[in-house]
Structures are given as C-alpha cells and as structure tokens.
Amino acid sequence: MTKTYSTEIKIQNVRGLHARATANFVKVADTFCSEIYVTNKDGLRVSGKSIMGLLMLGAPLGSILTLEANGNDAEKAIKALTELVDEKFGEAV
C-alpha cells in the first residue's frame, strides 16, 4: 500500500532554488521510486525530479514550498529532501 506524505519546506540558502541547488535536489529525488512534487505559493506544482520544473517555481531565499511524495518510499524521500533543504543544499554560502 502506497502512502502520500507532505510537508512545507523553507528555502534557506542565500541564492534560493537556483540551478546548482535544483540539480542537487533532483539528484536526491531520483534515488527514490516515489512520485515527488513541489508546489509554490501560487499553486504551481512541478515534478521534484525535473530541474526545469523546479527552476520554474522561482523560489528565492525565504520561499515556502510544499513538498509531496507518493509511493512505497515516500516517507524516506520527504525526510531526505527536507534534510537537503535544511542543510542549504550542501552549499557553504
């Protein structure tokens, strides 16, 4: 039985959800079988496994996004992606 998990994430790195951060997000998301979606405050919902989709969200520092995963490893996906965002995508800045 698959479950859906969701949480809100806050973009905390100075440059926001830019190309390198987005690539890191997709790299982690791709390790999971679950469907992963990210939605911005305007309701734009994109695949968490699409660099172009994530860039379309236009998420600068401080943006609140909804992260949703549906599948057998959805809970693990949400946890890993939330940690990545909380760690500012591994960027030193």
What are these regions (language model features)?
Residues 2-8, 64-66:
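Intrinsic-disorder/low-complexity, polar/charged segments enriched in Ser/Thr/Lys/Arg/Asp/Glu/Gln
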Residues 10-60:
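Compact, glycine-rich, soluble single-domain proteins
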Residues 61-93:
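C-terminal structural segments of small proteins and small subunits
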Residues 1-4, 43, 72:
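Short, glycine- and charge-enriched coil/turn segments that flank and shape catalytic ligand pockets
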